[in-house]
Amino acid sequence: MRRQFLFVCIPIVLAVTVKAQDAAQLKIGGGTIDIEFTSSPAQPLRKMIVDWIATAARSVSTYYAGYPVAHVHVAVNVRDGRGINSGRAFGWEHPHIQIAVGRSTSAAQFSDDWTITHEMVHLAFPSVPENNHWIEEGLATYVEPIARARAGNLTQEKIWGDMVEGMRQGLPKSGDRGLDFTHTWGRTYWGGALFCLLADVEIRKRTGNRMGLENGLRGILKSGGSIAVEWPLIRTLQTADRATGVPVLEQLYEKMRATPVSPDLDQLWKDLGIKFDGKRATFDDSAPLAAVRKAIGGG
């Protein structure tokens, strides 16, 4: 969740400095991450939390070819119970993330978690008007598993199986309008993610798989677009299109902004060479867009 208020291999420098009993600092991908604990966790939990945040930062840095902001403050609310929730990213001059962690959270729960990576992806995109909120959440929903997979933290079977299951939740229902005018949970998160997938595939088709969505997103960052600034969506998309050399995002936005669009997902999965039986994804590398699938997921 994001609020406006308050596959290339790159060398990533990781340093961990314990600043005080209730704080730590990471330096990853050119960014500094200051971690503050609202209450001091036991040392084993502290280490798991710091490692979990570092893993997410490395994943995001791999996808964006560097950490998306120079500095971010991460406030970890350590409380009773198990699990990770209540993640939020905030922008303006001093980007920060708030997230809650239960004292009894296990190593497996940290390993499986998507929340902190999702929030870090929010750092890499400008704040846009409220009616465009779907692009912020959709982008984080789409990029998070891909970034984790490219960093070696998720399997290809996992990311594509989850996409097959999830993307259908983003299809318009009866009475829905375009993405700018239908703000249900499914259309905001998965409808936005579907927009990103369609854009990623189309960019790769038009550029012979030389460019992908990440190249456009990196172009936004290089032009100064991050959570620290507020841009109109059309400016943001045009900036990304200039980076890829093809006007895919602007054209797709014009198509989907006001009008409900229902792409043939079954055909898309077939073209990408993805077969999903409800439990496990398998792949057909002879499919026409198999190379696109591999380039997106990094596998």
Where are these regions (language model features)?
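Boundary at the C-terminal end of the N-terminal hydrophobic targeting segment
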Residues: 18-20
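Juxtacatalytic substrate-recognition/specificity segment
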Residues: 22-128, 132
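Sec-exported extracytoplasmic/periplasmic mature domains
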Residues: 58-65, 122-125, 145-152, 200-208, ...
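N-terminal export leaders
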Residues: 2-6
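Soluble non-cytosolic domains of exported or imported proteins
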Residues: 43-55, 106-111, 115, 130, ...
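Beta/coil-rich, acidic/histidine-enriched accessory regions frequently appended to metallopeptidases
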Residues: 32, 226-299
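Acidic/His/Gly-enriched intrinsically disordered linker/tail segments
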Residues: 130-200, 205-207, 213, 218-227
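Bacterial N-terminal signal peptides
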Residues: 7-15
